[in-house]
Design a protein with these regions (language model features):
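A short mid-domain helix/strand-loop element embedded in enzyme catalytic domains
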Residues: 81-129, 149-152
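Short, charged/polar micro-motifs that form catalytic or ligand-binding hotspots
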Residues: 18-25, 105-110, 168
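Generic serine detector
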Residues: 19, 38-42, 99, 106, ...
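Conserved S-adenosyl-L-methionine
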Residues: 113-171
Length: 171
C-alpha cells in the first residue's frame, strides 16, 4: 500500500477519537490548517506581519482544543511525516475518507489512488521534448490525488521526462 497504510489508519482513528466537541471534518480541517501554518512559519526567515498572522491563526485554532487534543494533533503531524517517508500518495485524501467518509448526498466521492495512477499512466505521454511543456488538468476538486499521481508518474519516468516543473493554478 502506498504511503504507509497503518499510519494513515492511526491518523484517521485519532480524528475520530477527537470528534465530539467538534465534527470530524472540523477536526480534520483544523489539523491540516495547523500543520500547514506550522510548516509555513518554520521555513520563513523573517518574522513579518504575514508570519504573525499565521502564528495568531495557529494559536486561535489550537486554543479551541484541550492540552491532550493539542498533543494528539502534534502526534498526528508526526505520523503524517512518517507516512510520506514511506511513499508518496494521496495520504490526506485517504485519511479524510477513512475518518469522515464521503458524503454521497452532497456529491462527495473519493477517487481511489490506484485510479489516479492509472489515469496518469494513460493520459500523460511517455516522452517529452526538452523545449515542450507538459500540462494536465486536475478534473476533480478534492485533495489533489490526480496531481500527486501525475507527479509520481513523471518521477518514475525521469529518464525520459527530465527536469519537469509543476505549476498550480487555482480557478
Amino acid at each position: 500500500m502506498e504511503g504507509g497504510g497503518l499510519t494513515k489508519k492511526q491518523i484517521a482513528a485519532c480524528i475520530k477519537q477527537m470528534s465530539g466537541k467538534y465534527a470530524p471534518q472540523v477536526v480534520f480541517a483544523d489539523w491540516i490548517q495547523c500543520v500547514a501554518l506550522s510548516i509555513s512559519n518554520s521555513v520563513q526567515i523573517f518574522h513579518d506581519n504575514l508570519w504573525k498572522q499565521r502564528e495568531e491563526q495557529y494559536l486561535a485554532t489550537m486554543n479551541r482544543y484541550g492540552k491532550e487534543e493539542r498533543m494528539k494533533m502534534a502526534e498526528m503531524a508526526g505520523m503524517l511525516i512518517l507516512t510520506y517517508e514511506k511513499g508518496l500518495g494521496d495520504v490526506l485524501g485517504e485519511v479524510y475518507m477513512e475518518s469522515i467518509g464521503g458524503n454521497k448526498n452532497s456529491g462527495q466521492f473519493f477517487t481511489p489512488y490506484s485510479v489516479s495512477l492509472a489515469t496518469a499512466r494513460l493520459t500523460l505521454p511517455d516522452t517529452i521534448d526538452e523545449n515542450k511543456k507538459l500540462s494536465f488538468c486536475e478534473p476533480t476538486c478534492g485533495s489533489g490525488g490526480m496531481v500527486i499521481a501525475a507527479d509520481r508518474y513523471c518521477r518514475k519516468r525521469e529518464s525520459i521526462i527530465k527536469g519537469y516543473w509543476m505549476w498550480f493554478v487555482r480557478i
